[in-house]
């Protein structure tokens, strides 16, 4: 397959994960094993599944891992909304992360389409 580090969507997803880890440092301590953990796991699952899919031997397998990444992106998006509604995230970091996750989702959808048609 291909080197995952060459994919713009992986690069953007990795950056998203780093930013999620940074903003969740300020979440309440009682959330460390719940919302903080859930958001971090959903975020890190996106680039991890892209990377794993790149190591598979068929396009169908690659597409399946990209779909898992897309599911994780949707999950992360929800946890961002929940974090904002619980007032754990202010408007500025929320808007930045929300924009970024939606860019990632669009890129994944496009890549899934290309992989399936090849």
Placement of each model-derived feature along the sequence:
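Short, C-terminally biased terminal segments at protein or domain edges
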Residues: 1-118
